[in-house]
């Protein structure tokens, strides 16, 4: 699949770097002259990749010229892009690797060589989404069977000790340092040593740290519960070239990508070029804060890139975001993120690049920039790019980047004009320029149901009370006025407490957006320290947790001395990876659950993540607010969100004196001092060694040694999927969709969580019935995310979210109507009946169908249910790409029209056909059983998408390339 002569067209642009007789690069500025100088920095990266990979086949000279003429061609042409590398996490990585394994089977069946099937692009797979919180401080539960979910012996697996693969060095000749003996168990001498801690081994540093035993217990269960999946990952790393697996306990995909995998500048065979990445996690965009172009795409598109094909995108508009002014002392990076998020949503940047410039940029640290870049999927942009500048270089130097490589990097970036300097008198030209004054941003939270609904902390009490009054919706709970002051007494751990509307029952400093930001994490720790010293405590029934993005967070919280104080308030480290963030939180106590149900209370979760969709944390927690880590701690201490921090105290000290938030809020100077002393110079030291060394449990895993994976028919984790069952050597003509029924009639903002849940498997679900019939107990079900390698589970889990609102049913429930019989059934059961009857299916939806996390099973699941098309008002781009990639037609109502305006009930039978010649944006005609006809748009953006659809999806298209 490799290009025959990549770079040949523009070989004359290759030059030698001045400071080196060996290092070469494409001097792209010579190609464009003044045209190049006005290009946004992010577009310059696209242009370099196009020049370097131009072979006249996958990348044409016309594509290069189109990118160079970005000013006139933006939004009008499609361009291919070859990223330098790919990053996967296990939730989406396992179906990708299962598809690769299944593709080998299909290629062999049709007479091809299965050994040819392997990634052509460097691929790093981070196992970070399998962590579930079985143990926490509040309730050490009975451990699930460490072998849970693995009752079936993998009889076909031939044991082989696979040595951990050494990962390529990312931007340095030596590791970024190592932990000194006992380094993590030291506490700063400036802090009290009265709090005693039981040292355990940090799975990141393999050094004693003062944290509870919950980390090791959760990791032990994680390895037992997911042994079969982990063995498959290990087989993949040995069977496929260019695949490196980063084992559990290291950190989240996007954070490991930032801390370890990022190179900023690649070097292959003495050729220098910009680092770039695409991945299956939408938060891969975090690396744009480091000057690395990267964004999230679907799992199917990622597989294509892994096979040497480019990812295709519409040449984007680039919105220049000029930051001016400076933030005030009480605003955290998260406040800046949420402020920018709200502003960009209001402006409208969906499907565009955002590029930051202006005097305010230099005031933001790399961790601030990466936090802002990480949130870009929440305001709809493809990515948010911060060009490399002096702040970037200082960060790399402080984190141990090899000085020689750093010098070459700076020289190269300046030679190709990819280095941003405040002294430059001119900025690139942008499609649009917006200004954000950092002085205008105030401390805020977001909620109670959506990340874009930002509320100033000063307005929080009045806003929550307004939400109680409002009718049920994104900002309403419709609680009767006479019940808004209701309280329910509850006895917990021998003491009496009162719960009311607004009571906090979950407080989580969790993975994703915030844990990589030392300033906000240290601010939370310093606030906890001051709170403990003044005698403030968190009520014991509140489910508190701290789930770091990586072991570095443990390192700097420990070495700065604030970890014991967080622990004292209940914020103990429960593990490394995505937990509460993706619905894997430990359950609330029965006493609290009963009290909430008894009073029909609107209780709250406060978390420092980036998603707060309804029901994501816990079914009984109706209001969820996103906040900075110090505010999470503050609201946990207050015990309610129904508080005005300016006028109401958090509590009292031992003398009865009122303690207000401003009394314990750390100053910016305090935070920066601790950050300099305990973070910047040491936080990156041991990550590279830890990743390459792996951990003991991972290294001891057995894995098969074979070209084809030995599928176990008894397995409930890994199954050969049916995507290739009907694969032929040549694609058939596009078939019409005739007499299709509507499986679901959905509204606006249907998320991929609604379509394909990632959390726990409900006992009453179709997936649970399947697993129970195979001898598993509920404690062994694991989560949907963990079972993405089993198409039978994932198909049954499609549309199984209890918060799914199907207009056919009229209330939230994973149900639908099977119209031929009139029965109300689980969605899977209804789809199964339709398939037995040979009836094709479509889905009706509103605006923003498929929003939220990138999730390829949100397309694969409907495909296996028999869905042939989705008809919506609009789509989230990644999800639309997934639909095309699996062979489902994405149809859009004409502008201004929807199912209601057309008078559709969803009970009609629909038919449409496709012409032989499809083209992007073609209008199709739909006929219904009532005689009504209307037009829709086929939402194909380019000829590549049309080709993929005609092949029955990307997997079939790629498999045929090997025959």
UniProtKB/Swiss-Prot annotation:
Disulfide partners: none
Top-level division of the source organism's lineage: Eukaryota
CC per GO annotation: axon; cytoplasm; cytosol; neuronal cell body
GO BP term, pick one: cellular response to epidermal growth factor stimulus
Keyword Zinc attributed: no
NCBIfam families: aconitase_1, PRK09277.1, PRK12881.1
Similarity field: Belongs to the aconitase/IPM isomerase family.
Described function: RNA-binding protein that binds to iron-responsive elements (IRES), which are stem-loop structures found in the 5'-UTR of ferritin, and delta aminolevulinic acid synthase mRNAs, and in the 3'-UTR of transferrin receptor mRNA. Binding to the IRE element in ferritin results in the repression of its mRNA translation. Binding of the protein to the transferrin receptor mRNA inhibits the degradation of this otherwise rapidly degraded mRNA.
UniProt subunit comment: Interacts with RBCK1 only in iron-rich conditions. Interacts (when associated with the 4Fe-4S) with FBXL5. Interacts with CIAO1 and CIAO2A.
Descriptive protein name: Iron-responsive element-binding protein 2
């Amino acid at each position: 699949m490799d290009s025959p002569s990549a770079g040949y067209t523009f070989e004359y642009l290759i030059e030698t770097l001045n400071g080196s007789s060996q290092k070469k690069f494409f001097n792209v500025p010579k190609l464009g002259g003044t045209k190049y100088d006005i290009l946004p920095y992010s577009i310059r990266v696209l242009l370099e990749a196009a020049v370097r990979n131009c072979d006249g086949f996958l990348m044409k000279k016309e594509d290069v010229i189109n990118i160079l003429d970005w000013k006139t061609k933006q939004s009008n042409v499609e361009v291919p892009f070859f990223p330098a590398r790919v990053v996967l996490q296990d939730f989406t990585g396992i179906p990708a690797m299962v598809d690769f394994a299944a593709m080998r089977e299909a290629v062999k069946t049709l007479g091809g060589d299965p050994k040819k099937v392997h990634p052509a692009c460097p691929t790093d797979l981070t196992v970070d989404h399998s962590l579930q919180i079985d143990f926490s401080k509040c309730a050490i539960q009975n451990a699930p069977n460490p072998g849970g979910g693995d009752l079936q012996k993998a009889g076909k697996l031939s044991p082989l000790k696979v040595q951990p693969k050494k990962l390529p060095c990312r931007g340095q000749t030596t590791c970024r340092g190592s932990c000194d003996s006992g380094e993590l168990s030291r506490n700063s001498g400036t802090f009290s040593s009265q709090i005693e801690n039981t040292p355990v081994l940090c799975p990141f540093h393999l050094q004693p740290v003062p944290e509870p035993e919950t980390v090791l217990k959760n990791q032990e269960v994680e390895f037992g519960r997911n042994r079969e999946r982990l063995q498959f990952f290990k087989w993949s790393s040995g069977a496929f070239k260019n695949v490196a697996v980063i084992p559990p306990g290291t950190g989240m995909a996007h954070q490991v990508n930032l801390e370890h995998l990022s190179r900023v500048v690649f070097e292959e065979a003495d050729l220098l070029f910009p680092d770039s990445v695409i991945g299956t996690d939408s938060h891969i965009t975090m690396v744009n804060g480091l000057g690395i172009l990267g964004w999230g795409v679907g799992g199917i598109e990622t597989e294509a890139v892994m096979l040497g094909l480019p990812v295709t995108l519409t040449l984007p508009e680039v919105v220049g975001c000029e930051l001016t002014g400076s933030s005030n002392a009480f605003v955290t990076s998260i406040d800046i993120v949420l402020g920018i998020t709200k502003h960009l949503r209001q402006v409208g940047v969906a499907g565009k690049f955002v590029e930051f410039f202006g005097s305010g940029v230099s005031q933001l640290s790399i961790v601030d920039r990466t936090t802002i870049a990480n949130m870009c999927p929440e305001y709809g942009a493809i990515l948010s790019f911060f060009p490399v500048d002096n702040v970037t270089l200082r960060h790399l130097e402080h984190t141990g980047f090899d000085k020689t490589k750093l010098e070459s990097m700076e020289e190269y970036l300046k030679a190709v004009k990819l280095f941003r300097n405040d002294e430059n008198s001119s900025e690139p030209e942008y499609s649009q320029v917006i200004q954000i004054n950092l002085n205008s941003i105030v401390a805020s939270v977001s909620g109670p149901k959506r990340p874009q609904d930002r509320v100033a902390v000063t307005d929080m009490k009045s806003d929550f009370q307004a939400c109680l009054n409002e009718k049920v919706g994104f900002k309403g709970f419709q609680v009767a006025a006479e019940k808004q002051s209701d309280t329910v007494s509850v006895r917990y751990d021998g003491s009496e407490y009162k719960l009311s509307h607004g009571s906090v029952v979950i407080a989580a400093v969790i993975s994703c957006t915030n844990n990589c930001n030392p300033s906000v994490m240290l601010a939370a720790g310093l606030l906890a320290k001051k709170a403990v010293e003044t005698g403030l405590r968190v009520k014991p029934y509140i489910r508190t947790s701290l789930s770091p993005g990586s072991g570095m967070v443990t390192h700097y919280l420990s070495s700065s001395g604030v970890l014991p104080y967080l622990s004292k308030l209940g914020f103990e480290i429960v593990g490394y990876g995505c937990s509460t963030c993706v619905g894997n939180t430990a359950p609330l106590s029965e006493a609290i659950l009963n009290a909430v149900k008894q009073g029909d209370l609107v209780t709250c979760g406060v978390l420092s993540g980036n998603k707060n969709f309804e029901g994501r944390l816990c079914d009984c927690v109706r209001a969820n607010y996103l906040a900075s880590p110090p505010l999470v701690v503050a609201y946990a201490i207050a015990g309610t969100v129904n508080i005005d921090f300016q006028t109401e105290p958090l509590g009292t000290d031992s003398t009865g004196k009122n303690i207000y938030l401003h009394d314990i809020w750390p100053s910016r100077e305090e935070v920066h001092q601790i950050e300099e002393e305990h973070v910047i110079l040491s936080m990156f030291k041991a990550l590279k060694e830890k990743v390459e060394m792996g951990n003991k449990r991972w290294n001891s895993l057995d894995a098969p040694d074979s070209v084809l994976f030995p599928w176990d028919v008894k397995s409930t984790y890994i199954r050969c999927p049916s995507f290739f069952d009907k694969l032929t050597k040549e694609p058939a003509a596009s078939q019409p969709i005739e007499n299709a029924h509507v499986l679901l009639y959905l509204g606006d903002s249907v998320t991929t969580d609604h379509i394909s849940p990632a959390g726990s498997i409900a006992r009453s679900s179709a997936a649970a019935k399947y697993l129970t019939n195979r001898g598993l107990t509920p404690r062994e079900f694991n989560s949907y995310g963990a079972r993405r390698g089993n198409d039978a589970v994932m198909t049954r889990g499609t549309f199984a979210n209890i918060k799914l609102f199907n207009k056919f049913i009229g209330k939230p429930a994973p149900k639908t109507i099977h119209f031929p019989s009139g029965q109300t059934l689980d969605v899977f059961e209804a789809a199964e009946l339709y398939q037995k009857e040979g009836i094709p299916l479509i889905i009706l939806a509103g605006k923003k169908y498929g929003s939220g996390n990138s999730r390829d099973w949100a397309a694969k699941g409907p495909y296996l249910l028999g869905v042939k098309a989705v008809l919506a008002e609009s789509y989230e781009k990644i999800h639309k790409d997934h639909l095309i990639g699996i062979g489902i037609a994405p149809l859009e109502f004409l502008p201004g029209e929807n199912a209601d305006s057309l008078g559709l009930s969803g009970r009609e039978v629909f038919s449409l056909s496709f012409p032989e010649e499809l083209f992007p944006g073609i209008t199709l005609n739909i006929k219904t059983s009532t005689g009504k006809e209307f037009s829709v748009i086929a939402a194909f953006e380019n000829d590549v998408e049309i080709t993929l659809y005609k092949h029955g999806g990307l997997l079939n298209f790629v498999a045929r390339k090997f025959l």
